[in-house]
Amino acid sequence: MWTASFIRPRTSVITSEFGSGRLFNGRLTTRHLGVDFRGALGEQVRAANRGVVALVGNFFLAGNVVYIDHGGGVVTAYFHLSKTLVSAGDTVTRGQVIGLVGATGRVTGPHLHWAARYGAVTVNPLDLLSIDRNWYSAAAARKQVRAPQASGAR
C-alpha cells in the first residue's frame, strides 16, 4: 500500500528506546514495546507512511490512540495523544498530521509512544525507516511466474 519510505512521526529526541527494561520497585518487570519521542502538549504527530486508519480510541494505559494499517502486514500505533485528528476508515498520507502530543493514559508527562507490528509480532518501529520503499511491490513481483520464451526466438 505504501509507495515511499517510512518516516519518523516526530523529529524530536527519543526519550525511551524499544526493548529497554521497565523497572517497578527496583525489579525488571517488562520491556518497552515502542519508542518514546519528546513532545510538548499539542505538538503535531505525523503518519509514518500512507495507510488506512484501522482504530481510533481511548484506552486505560495507552490513552488516546491511532492505529494505521499500511498493508503488507505492517501496522503502526501512536499512543498518549491529546487529540486525534483522523477517524477509523480514513486513508492517510505519509507525513499527514494525525494527532497531537498528549499525556493521556498512564504516563508521567506528554510524549508520543510509537509502536509497530508486523503480523502478530511487535517490532522496533525505527526498523521501518530502513525498509526500501519498493519492498512491498518487490515481494509481490517475486511471486510472479515469467512466461516461457517462444521457441526459435533469438
Where are each of the predicted segments found?
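Catalytic cores of peptidoglycan-degrading enzymes
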Residues: 6-153
